[in-house]
C-alpha cells in the first residue's frame, strides 16, 4: 500500500466515523487528494469500505504481534493490546457502524481471526487463574468492543483527555474480567 492509499484510508476512518453517510468528496478532501485520485484506488464506496475493514484487521494483527514481541507476560500482552486498540477507538467505531449497515459477511472470518488472537491472550491469562471463571469468552469479546466504542465516544466528544483514554480502557476492561482478591 502506498502513501496515498494509506492517507485515503486514514481520512475515511476519520470522516466516516463522524458521519457514516458523508460523501466521498469529504474523504478525498481530508486525504488531500482529488475525488478522481480516490477513485483511482477505490472505484466506489463499497471498495473503500472493504479496504478500511481489511486495514483494521491488519492493524489489529500488528498490535497483537507487537504486544507478544514486547512482553512475555500474557497479562502485559493483553494490556498492551487493549491500550493500543483504545487509542484507535474511531476505527473500531467505524467498523461496528459499517457492519451494522452493510453486508460484510465475507469479512467475518478475518474479524473472527482477530478475535481469536485476542481470546488467546485472555485464555493465557485465564490459565494463570486471573480471569473470572464464570466470564465466557463471548462476553469478553463484547466487552472488548464496548470498550472500543466507549473510547471512541470519549475521544470524539473530547470529554476525556486523549492521553488518558488507553489507561481508562485498560482499567475498565481489566476490572471487568479479572478476579478481585
Predicted features and spans:
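Short secondary-structure transition hinges
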Residues: 86-119
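All-alpha amphipathic helical-bundle segments outside canonical DNA-binding/catalytic cores
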Residues: 76, 109, 127-143, 162-167
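C-terminal peripheral helix-coil segments that are non-catalytic and often amphipathic
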Residues: 116, 120-128, 153-181
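Hydrophobic alpha-helical connector segments
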Residues: 51, 62-91
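Basic, helix-initiating cap at the start of DNA-binding domains
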Residues: 1-18, 22-30, 47-50
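Short hydrophobic/aromatic patch on the recognition helix
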Residues: 32-42
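Residue-level detection of the helix-turn-helix DNA-binding "recognition helix"
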Residues: 43-44, 54
Amino acid at each position: 500500500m502506498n502513501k496515498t492509499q494509506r492517507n485515503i484510508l486514514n481520512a475515511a476512518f476519520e470522516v466516516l466515523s463522524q458521519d457514516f453517510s458523508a460523501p466521498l468528496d469529504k474523504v478525498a478532501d481530508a486525504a488531500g487528494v482529488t475525488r478522481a485520485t480516490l477513485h483511482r484506488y477505490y472505484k466506489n464506496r463499497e471498495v473503500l469500505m472493504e479496504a478500511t475493514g481489511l486495514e483494521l484487521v491488519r492493524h489489529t494483527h500488528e498490535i497483537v504481534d507487537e504486544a507478544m514481541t514486547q512482553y512475555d507476560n500474557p497479562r502485559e500482552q493483553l494490556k498492551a493490546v487493549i491500550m493500543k486498540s483504545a487509542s484507535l477507538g474511531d476505527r473500531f467505531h467505524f467498523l461496528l457502524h459499517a457492519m451494522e449497515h452493510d453486508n460484510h459477511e465475507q469479512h467475518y472470518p478475518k474479524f473472527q481471526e482477530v478475535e481469536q488472537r485476542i481470546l488467546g491472550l485472555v485464555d493465557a491469562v485465564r490459565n494463570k487463574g486471573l480471569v473470572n471463571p464464570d466470564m465466557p469468552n463471548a462476553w469478553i469479546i463484547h466487552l472488548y468492543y464496548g470498550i472500543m466504542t466507549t473510547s471512541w465516544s470519549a475521544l470524539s466528544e473530547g470529554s476525556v483527555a486523549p492521553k488518558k483514554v488507553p489507561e481508562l480502557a485498560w482499567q475498565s476492561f481489566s476490572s471487568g474480567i479479572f478476579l478481585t482478591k
